[in-house]
Amino acid sequence: MIREPAVAGRFYPANPRELKLQIEQLLGEAVATPKLHALGCVVPHAGYKYSGHVAGAVFQRLELPKKYIILCPRHYREGQALAIMS
């Protein structure tokens, strides 16, 4: 199943080029520090204008592995308590 963007144009730009530019800007605003090897992290996922600077700072600081797992909450009561995307 490929999930279509649910909030494109509201929480982040709908245009892929504008989105890429905004993400690069958020990552570029982060203070340059040595990369950390972390076993996990908690990152906010609100609209980029609200929490993008925090997410950018976290991701800029991490040494990202080749494979990782993303855990996220449901925003609605419907659906399974736990799901795995393919």
Predicted regions and their residues:
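Active-site histidine-anchored catalytic micro-motif
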Residues: 1-86
